[in-house]
Amino acid sequence: MSLQPQAETLSFEAEVKQLLHLVAHSLYSNKEIFLRELISNSSDAADKLRYQALSDAALYENDADLKIWIDFDKDNRTITIRDNGIGMSREEVIENLGTIAKSGTRAFRELLAEKKAEDSQLIGQFGVGFYSAFIVADRVVVRTRRAGMKADQGVEWESTGEGEYTLKNIDKPTRGTEVVLHLKESEEEFLDPLRLRAIITKYSDHILLPIVMKKIKTSGADDEDKNETPEEEVVNRANALWVLPKDKIKDEEYKELYKHIAHDFEDPLAWVHNKVEGKLEYTTLLYIPARAPFDLWNREGQRGLKLYVKRIFIMDDAEHFMPMYLRFVKGIVDSNDLPLNISRELLQSNEVINKIKAGCVKRILSLLEDLAKNDKEKYASFWKAFGQVLKEGPAEDFANRDRIANLLRFASTHNDTDEQNVSLQDYISRMKPEQNKIYYIVADTYTSAKNSPLLEVFRKKDIEVLLMSDRVDEWLVAHLNEFEGKSLQSIAKGTLDLGDLEKEEKVETEKFEKDFDELLKQFKEVLGEKIKDVRITHRLTDSPTCVVFDENEMSGHLQRLLIQTGQDFMQAKPILEINPSHPLILRVKNESDKTRFNRWADLLLNQALLAEGEQLKDPASFVKGLNELLLDS
């Protein structure tokens, strides 16, 4: 096999340069995390080797005793982190150490361009990982060889953490990766074995792999022993944290394990640890992150839990344990009932998987219910980060639809804020005695919903309306038809139906209908194919007109969403409703000039469409007609 050129100098991609700058300038106060990150990488490398070796044992190269070694050299001011995990090929070195994952590049650029994100947020979103080495080092050397490749196919990577790095081929008899940090002059504290041990205990005690260091010699050791090979000792617990009893695990240990498995810089928002025994035996440790990842809305992106079978790592991102609407959940599943060689294909049709999935969903929903009841501030944080994703739940999980519905939060006319903090239970508790429906409106924005003329009669009668403006809301209400026996009713579709709450208004409207019959005919004649119908309404108190859509047709908001996604569909025409008591309508009713009447009819329709959120097909004509009416008045 021909080798790559012996040595070459390459440039970091622009995003890596930015990330390196952030790491160097933003993490200095917490610089000891470099060791946590590099140990975590070594642990991941061992997990990958174990998994690939299930189908190709030769990858172990007669060395299946996986470890991480930490060493230091005071004279040369170096710290070395070495593992015998999967290692990397030359191409993988370039991909892993020279670029940010392609899925994250665009998002990284956008956050940098906006300059809204704190440095810590950027680091938390995209991971510190290997680059944390440059917090304490002014030069880093990586030597690596992928398992299964020849000894002369090793690679050496070197950089000072600025604009470039060099690559060359080397002989490396053993597989795995060695990272050598040449420390800055100010970082001598990390050349102390006790300091290194303290960091490992603090951040990496939970790592399943043994972390090995040379034994510290006692002060009475003989000088004769100087030339002997120092004894090694394991300096972490090296056991599966999740198999321990919950009362034996500290919160800090839970948090550090989360950071390791989720590659997150921040503490989790909440977690739940559970062991199931009986016919089916498994342990789950599930975390809810504090912040949404940059790729939350990429439904095809990597997601899922870490799968272990009898404490042996099987795979990352096992997506079959969580439904799509809970794709933000991180964690571990450790089963005693799955085969060690289970594949992603087998996960799809395995009955054990389905039972574990049901248990995982139950635990997460219970955790969210507990937060919603007992820690409203924390639940508000959860909702801000993941509420829109949870709204996908009623459509995807019929069995848990009622539990999910109880967890939903909305903005409402009850509060003068766009904060989504009203539950369906809250709404029902404030319903009028005669009221039997939950009213809502879906609009492009909160402001558009709040100012909709369709709300006028509801404000007059002090009836609460849920204000929805998330893109997912149309999907939600299409699948959530009722809650606790109360049907959900859009105020933008069909005729107004307030039951006994609108008796007086109905009587008034009936009085107007005969008197306005001729006006309605004139409107229909002028507006023609632009509308489906024109009718008198009592839902307006301040506005002259509004538009609604038929009960069984798509709302204007949903039609706009479909247009934005390029979907082909039969567009529904709006129904124009007029307020018979409004001065403008009375003026138009008495308009004898046909040209002016036509202008008024167009103006009133377009005005209603704008209030509904619609974009006018011909705004110039609208402005021209408006100006002409103003000049005539």
Curated annotation (Swiss-Prot):
Cited Pfam families: HATPase_c_3, HSP90
Gene Ontology cellular component annotations, sorted alphabetically: cytosol
UniProt cross-references to SUPFAM superfamilies, sorted A to Z: ATPase domain of HSP90 chaperone/DNA topoisomerase II/histidine kinase, HSP90 C-terminal domain, Ribosomal protein S5 domain 2-like
InterPro entries named in the record: HATPase_C_sf, Heat_shock_protein_90_CS, HSP90_C, Hsp90_fam, Hsp90_N, Ribosomal_Su5_D2-typ_SF
Annotated segments matching region B: 345-560
Stretches for region C: 561-633
GO BP terms in the entry: DNA damage response; protein folding; response to heat
A Gene Ontology molecular function term of the record: unfolded protein binding
Residue span of region A: 1-344
Keywords linked to the UniProt accession: ATP-binding, Chaperone, Cytoplasm, Nucleotide-binding, Stress response
Domain of life per record: Bacteria
Keyword Ribonucleoprotein: no
Compartment(s) where it occurs, according to its Swiss-Prot or TrEMBL record: Cytoplasm
Role: Molecular chaperone. Has ATPase activity.
Subunit-structure text: Homodimer.
Protein name per the record: Chaperone protein HtpG
Organism: Coxiella burnetii (strain RSA 493 / Nine Mile phase I)
